[in-house]
């Protein structure tokens, strides 16, 4: 032990020769080295290493001391140091001696005490080798097991210096081998001065890390790191006086760097290191912040909607209108363009009437009352449902109901509509004459029109050659609720018109179900008896409508067939009273022989086609009359579903045919005919030919006229649009397959039975 203390003192006495002074250039590229590392524990642990192995490491510092040698090499260069001092004679002699000693010491396994790394040059190596063997003998027997045993490696102590053989020299790396007993170890020593190491081993030299806050972590170390630590200790040359075998805490911290678990790959709050530094340290566990989230723009789904739902919705047009509705819409649009002078007061009044009435109004029917005296140029229009014409003095009104409207469900209230003053018999004759002329014209027009049917709601006014101003337009609407509510709504509407200083207008509510007994008490004033009113009516009928006076039922029958009723008000010269009477005139060819007389004892509000006496006051009887009238009116146009039909242009269309069809806003689209409906009037005149079709590629169906359909295969070249893709092509493909399957035999089977 005295020799060990002497060596330690000598090492401390010469730090400037082979120690710190020579290590200054080497410390610059290794900023992670710790200055002042105590090499004493290394010296204390070297006692258990065999002699031949420790001498190899000891010779390098001694050989480098006499001249001004380069700084001590890194761990890999310790084995190369004998070659570096080859020109020196003393180093060669020592190398040969060590080789011989190592060969003799390997089988013996005798321990020796290696000298200090920074031994003074004055001390010759021969006395050290003679003095060292007896010193560590008390410790060696406990540490050295039999040579070649399984626990041979356990003799090595971390921090001890061993002698390795340099096999290959590669750029920035050394391949070395170490023989210990019967075992041979080989490895590669990497140059850590260039800031990279083997894969998976953290770089501890650069950058410098602070581990002083973790002194408790001290696991075992690897040889490579310890060799580098020994180099640092030699460079520093600082050896404390305390020869205790306890390692220095700073050395223990350095040892814990290698054997402790590597730090996690990401640390919360860790700064991003410079990019170049990361580039030089691939696959190293350098503290990194958590990875950033990569913002990827969401892919917009343009053409990836489900085809079954979206395409079906796209195929539906904005307004699916049949021929009937199209005609009415076109007529309304034309009338709106020309007759745009409807006052706001009339519209407001119309809305109030709708709100007050309990009856549910059909949405397709719109009441549009307009003030008299405006837009006289509208007299050139046709197809009036209800016509109210002014006589020269704007006192009397004539209401004409068209044959195309279901007047069995729409009876005008005469007690409200037909009230004016100072109407003489001559004016009454003029009224009847005008009514007959209009009825004849209307009958001729409707017989020649092809699209005339009972469901069309006409909105254009009829021409009135003798009127000074145009009358308001009246809509007929079906009666669906009780008559008392309708009466109240009519009364309020009339009072509002009177308060607004406007001429009385015909009401748009249906009063066919009113009790017949209400009219006399409301329409006749107490001062005017029924005899006077009846006499006035009789005078009018004698001049213009000759016929019997006792045929109210015959009158009702004729009216039920043709449904033309004329309501006229015959006002007396007295201003304080008025009486109303109703005369029904049919519009058939035998119009001149029709009966229109109304007796004074009868009600003035009976339906024109009533089969019962007008004096009946029960609501049930009037409702029965309405049902009979509606049944008789429905027979005017006969509709039948057929399986085969010939169009006016000579084409034969059958049920199941594949056709091209067109709807406004969409291209020509393939469709299949489901049903064919042919409507004719009672005289055999063709009204319409309509087909219900189903669209290919869509679950929707439509009603279209046969004139708007064209055969699929015959018109394929002219109808097919090559530019369209997607569902259009799919529908075309389905239609083509269906058309190929529709052979003449299949058509014959489909059309052999009439439905």
Swiss-Prot record:
Give the Basic and acidic residues compositional bias ranges.
346-356, 368-381, 422-444
Its chief place of residence is nucleus
Where is this protein found?
Answer: Nucleus
Region entry Interaction with the H2A.Z/H2AZ1, spans: 423-574
The answer to keyword Transcription regulation applying to this record is yes
Biased composition, class Basic residues, residue ranges: 292-301
- Which domain of life, per UniProt? Eukaryota
Q: Where is this region: Interaction with HDAC1 and MTA1?
A: 148-373
One GO cellular component term, please give it.
nucleus
Q: Please note every region of biased composition (Pro residues).
A: 64-76, 112-126
The record ties this protein, via PROSITE patterns, to:
PWWP
State the residue spans of region: Disordered. 1-153, 282-301, 334-384, 400-562, 578-626
- Please identify the protein, giving its name as recorded: PWWP domain-containing protein 2A
State the organism of origin: Homo sapiens (Human)
Upper lineage is: Eukaryota, Metazoa, Chordata, Craniata, Vertebrata
Gene this chain is encoded by: PWWP2A
């Amino acid at each position: 032990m005295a020799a060990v203390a002497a060596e330690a003192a000598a090492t401390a006495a010469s730090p400037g020769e082979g120690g710190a002074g020579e290590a200054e250039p080497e410390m610059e590229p290794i900023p992670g080295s710790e200055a002042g590392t105590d090499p004493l524990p290394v010296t204390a642990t070297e006692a258990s290493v065999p002699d031949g192995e420790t001498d190899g490491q000891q010779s390098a510092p001694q050989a480098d001391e006499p001249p001004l040698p380069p700084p001590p090499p890194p761990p890999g260069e310790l084995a190369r140091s004998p070659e570096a001092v080859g020109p020196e004679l003393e180093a060669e002699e020592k190398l040969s001696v060590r080789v011989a000693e190592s060969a003799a010491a390997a089988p013996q396994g005798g321990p020796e005490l290696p000298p200090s790394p920074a031994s003074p040059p004055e001390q010759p190596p021969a006395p050290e080798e003679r003095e060292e063997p007896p010193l560590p003998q008390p410790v060696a027997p406990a540490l050295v097991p039999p040579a070649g045993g399984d626990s041979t490696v356990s003799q090595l102590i971390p921090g001890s210096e061993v002698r390795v053989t340099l096999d290959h020299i590669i750029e920035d790396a050394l391949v070395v081998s170490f023989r210990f007993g019967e075992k041979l170890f080989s490895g590669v020593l990497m140059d850590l001065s260039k800031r990279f190491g083997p894969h998976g081993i953290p770089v501890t030299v650069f950058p410098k890390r602070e581990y002083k806050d973790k002194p408790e972590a001290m696991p075992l170390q690897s040889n490579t790191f310890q060799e580098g630590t020994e180099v640092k200790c030699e460079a520093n040359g600082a050896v404390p006086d305390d020869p205790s075998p306890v390692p220095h805490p700073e050395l223990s911290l350095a040892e814990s760097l290698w054997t402790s678990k590597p730090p996690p790959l990401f640390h919360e709050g860790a700064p991003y290191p410079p990019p170049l530094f990361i580039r030089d340290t691939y696959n190293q566990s350098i503290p990194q912040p958590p990875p950033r989230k990569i913002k990827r723009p969401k892919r917009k789904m343009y053409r990836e909607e489900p085809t079954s739902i979206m395409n079906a919705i796209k195929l539906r047009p904005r307004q699916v209108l049949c021929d009937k509705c199209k005609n009415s819409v076109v007529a309304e649009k034309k009338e709106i363009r020309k007759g745009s002078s409807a006052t706001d007061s009339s519209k407001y009044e119309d809305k109030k009437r709708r709100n007050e009435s309990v009856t549910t109004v059909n949405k397709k029917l719109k009441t549009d009352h307009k003030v008299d005296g405006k837009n006289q140029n509208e007299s050139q229009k046709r197809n009036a449902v209800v016509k109210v014409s002014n006589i020269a003095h704007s006192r009397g009104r004539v209401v004409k109901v068209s044959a195309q409207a279901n007047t069995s469900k729409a009876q005008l209230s005469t007690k409200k509509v037909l009230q004016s003053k100072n109407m003489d018999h001559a004016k009454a004759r003029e009224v009847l004459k005008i009514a007959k002329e209009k009825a004849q014209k209307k009958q001729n027009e409707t017989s020649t029109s092809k699209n005339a049917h009972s469901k069309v709601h006409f909105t254009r006014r009829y021409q009135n050659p003798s009127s000074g101003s145009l009358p308001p337009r009246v809509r007929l609407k079906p009666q669906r609720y009780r008559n008392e509510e309708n009466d109240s709504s009519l009364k309020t509407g009339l009072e509002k018109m009177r308060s607004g200083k406007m001429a009385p207008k015909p009401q748009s509510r249906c009063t066919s179900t009113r009790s017949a007994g209400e009219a006399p008490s409301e329409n006749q004033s107490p001062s005017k008896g029924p005899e006077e009113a009846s006499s006035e009516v009789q005078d009018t009928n004698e001049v213009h409508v000759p016929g019997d006076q006792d045929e109210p039922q015959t009158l009702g029958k004729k009216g039920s067939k043709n449904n033309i009723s004329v309501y006229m008000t015959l006002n007396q010269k007295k201003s304080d009273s008025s009486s109303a009477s109703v005369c029904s005139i049919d519009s058939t060819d035998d119009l001149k022989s029709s009966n229109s007389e109304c007796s004074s004892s009868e009600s003035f509000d009976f339906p024109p086609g009533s089969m019962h006496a007008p004096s009946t006051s029960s609501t049930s009887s009037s409702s029965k009359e309405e049902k009979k009238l509606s049944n008789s009116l429905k027979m005017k146009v006969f509709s039948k579903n057929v399986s085969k039909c010939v169009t006016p242009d000579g084409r034969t269309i059958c049920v199941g045919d594949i056709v091209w069809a067109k709807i406004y806003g969409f291209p020509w689209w393939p469709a299949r005919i489901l049903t064919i409906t042919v409507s004719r009037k009672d005289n055999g005149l063709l009204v319409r030919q309509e087909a219900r079709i189903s669209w290919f590629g869509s679950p929707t169906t439509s009603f279209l006229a046969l004139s708007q359909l064209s055969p699929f295969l015959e018109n394929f070249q002219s109808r097919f649009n090559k530019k369209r893709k997607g569902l259009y092509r799919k529908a075309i493909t389905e239609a083509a397959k269906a058309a190929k399957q529709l052979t003449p035999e299949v058509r014959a089977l489909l059309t052999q039975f009439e439905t």
